[in-house]
């Protein structure tokens, strides 16, 4: 019938895609593991407050998934032969994304009471005590997105996977020590520290690969 068989090395394919699968799986656990630990030390009311903050934070960073889906194919087309264009485009997106993260974090802080009342109602106004910490995490997630994408297109997905695995382990260990004393604040302090560590890993290896910080404002025209 004119069909041709194409040989596929299944083991090689699995080996290549495994880091992506692990990264997705760990990413799903990344923002939920602290809730599991919190359940052992705080009230159901506190859990509700924390989960409301997490849902709002995820909503504030939904644009990152869209950006990744658009940006990674575009940058991948430049990585082999047009490195200068890749650096220029990545720098533009990096600066714009970081500025976007700052703006969103500021809006969340300035209008926190109004947003909480509008979305969750009066019973959740206590969430405003923790908004500053959630907004820091929002900014950190925007800060790291371009560096993470650069590692993916540079065939460094294993580094991303090791990074999230390490920081997940960090969250679990530190949470067990700080949550019994600091409760919700402890979980948020740990999550902020984990994002700083992960962003540092991404930044270091992206800089090592391209020898630029992707902060050159001259590229934004």
Predicted features along the sequence, with ranges:
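Helix-loop junctions and terminal segments of transmembrane helices
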Residues: 57-82, 150-153
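Interfacial transmembrane-helix starts/ends
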Residues: 14, 83-99, 103-111, 128-131
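Interhelical loop/hinge segments that connect adjacent transmembrane helices in multipass membrane
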Residues: 1-31, 74, 78-85, 210-221
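Residue-level recognition of pore/gate-forming positions within transmembrane alpha-helices
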Residues: 28, 55-58, 138, 164-169, ...
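Interfacial segments at transmembrane-helix termini and the short loops linking adjacent helices
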Residues: 44, 84, 110-139, 185
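Membrane-interface helix-loop junctions in multi-pass transport and translocation proteins
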Residues: 168-200, 207, 212
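Membrane-interface junctions at transmembrane-helix termini in multi-pass inner-membrane proteins
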Residues: 135-165, 206
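Alpha-helical transmembrane segments of polytopic membrane transporters and translocases
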Residues: 18-19, 34-36, 48-64, 96
């Amino acid at each position: 019938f004119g069909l041709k068989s194409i040989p596929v090395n299944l083991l090689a394919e699995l080996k290549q895609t495994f880091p992506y699968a692990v990264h997705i799986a760990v990413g799903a656990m990344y923002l939920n593991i602290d809730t599991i630990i919190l359940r052992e030390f705080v009230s159901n009311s506190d859990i509700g407050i924390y989960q409301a903050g997490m849902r709002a934070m995820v909503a504030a960073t939904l644009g990152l998934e869209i950006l990744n889906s658009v940006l990674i194919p575009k940058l991948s087309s430049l990585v082999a032969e047009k490195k200068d264009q890749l650096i220029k485009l990545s720098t533009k997106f990096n600066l714009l994304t970081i500025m976007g993260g700052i703006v969103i974090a500021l809006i969340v802080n300035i209008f926190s009471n109004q947003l909480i009342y509008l979305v969750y109602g009066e019973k959740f106004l206590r969430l405003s005590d923790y908004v500053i910490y959630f907004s820091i995490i929002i900014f950190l997630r925007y800060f790291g997105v371009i560096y993470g994408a650069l590692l993916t297109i540079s065939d460094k997905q294993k580094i991303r996977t090791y990074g999230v695995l390490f920081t997940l382990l960090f969250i679990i260990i530190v949470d067990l020590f700080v949550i019994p004393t600091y409760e919700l604040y402890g979980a948020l302090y740990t999550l902020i520290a984990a994002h700083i560590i992960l962003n540092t890993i991404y930044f270091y290896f992206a800089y090592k690969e391209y020898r630029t910080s992707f902060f050159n404002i001259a590229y934004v025209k």
